[in-house]
Amino acid sequence: DDTAKSGVVRIGKSADMTSFKEFVGKASTDSYTGQSVYKVTATGLEPNTVYYYVYGSNGKFSSPVMYRTLSTEKFKLLYISDIQVSSDVEDGREESYVWQKTLGTALDQNDDISFIVSAGDQTQHGDRANEWAGTLSPAALRSYAMATTVGNHDRKGETYPFYVNNPNEYRGTTPANVDENYWFRYGDVLFIVYNTQIFNVYDQYQFTLDAIAKNPDATWRVAVMHHDIYGTGHHAADDDNKLLAAIYSALIDRFEIDVCLTGHEHLYGRSFFMKDTKPVKDQKYNADGAVVDPVGTVYFTASSASGKNRIEDYDYEWLDFKYVSEEPSYSTIEFTKNSFTLKTYGVDSKKQIDECKIVKTDTSYSPVDPNYKGMDTDMLQRYLGKWYVIIQIAIEVARYVV
């Protein structure tokens, strides 16, 4: 309804909606497509509770939709990337179908998923409503929250921010053409979601510092970004990826990030634990095969959730595991206060492809000064120590100026 000034969501605990709490949002207009967009934020939901909600405007509402909250003490999430529905071929129907199959299979096999993390490239062109329609077409998405990440294809247009409603956005000195960095907390886990289209070292450092300073009691720190800085395929050798590796590897080392979830490559893989840009292969394991108090950070790269996988066989020094297959896959990640377990499955075979387990006996981190306004020296050295960084900076400046 283009005449509505605001969107409304009503949430209750029974499907007949006789009792509910109402949340009112604001309307905006997508400057590219002219569509009206309504964003509503609901608060106060309790864990382990079944809710029903309706949405609408001007007194007209949808049918009730069920939404179930689960525990925050221990939980499981679904990790995918590169849905990347493209309207160039069959209006995106085949890719939408494969994406629905991937999501449906994952949820059928895991009825205890709390929410979904997408590591970027939700659509192919970033400016087409029909591609977003394909990405958001699975009915299951109405009952699950999905934390999205800006990818290089999302930045091709300006529609991305009209389809997401992210919390705790950080607006730095460099303008983002599509959306900002943001963070969110679920239980003991702090998720730090980066827009890797932003090359500003200072902004990314201050954003990370701000997120961590506001969550000093988190026992896990998870970075989510689109570009696979320790990835599986040809993109890992691209100049922009090398630039990003210089920025983010130092950032992740400095703030002792435990796990980094990425996409971009359309090819599943897992790095060794990385520190100071080098694999740390000498780790301590328990009887269950879990890494105990690891040194460094492990980086994961997801395949394409819509089946647009690449068949490439690269042997990078940082790669511990890779799965070269046209079969789409998905990963589940289970957290407790002291443990992390990632399992990856093939969509067609339903067989487990990979597993990575971490156990912490010490959940503390080095202290940070929330008032520090400088920049990490090692981060700056890595950033400026690459000849291609200077070229890339010039390209980025030219892009904003022209």
Task: Give the role of each language-model region.
Residues 1-89, 108-109, 326, 336-375:
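Acidic, histidine-bearing metal-coordination/catalytic regions of metal-dependent phosphoesterases
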Residues 20-33, 78-101, 165-173, 231-238, ...:
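Acidic/histidine-rich helix-loop elements
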Residues 36-42, 50-66, 130-221, 247-248, ...:
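Extended active-site neighborhood of metal-dependent phosphoesterases/phosphodiesterases
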Residues 79-81, 115-121, 125, 145-152, ...:
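Active-site neighborhood of phospho(di)ester-bond hydrolases with catalytic His/Asp-centered motifs
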Residues 85-89, 123-128, 152-158, 180, ...:
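Active-site environment of divalent metal-dependent phosphoester hydrolases
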Residues 96-156, 254:
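Core catalytic region of metal-dependent phosphoesterases/phosphodiesterases
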Residues 101-104, 108, 373-402:
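Alpha-helical segments with a strong preference for the paired helices of cellulosomal dockerin domains
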Residues 218-260, 272, 278:
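Active-site-proximal segments of metal-dependent phosphoesterases and phosphodiesterases across multiple
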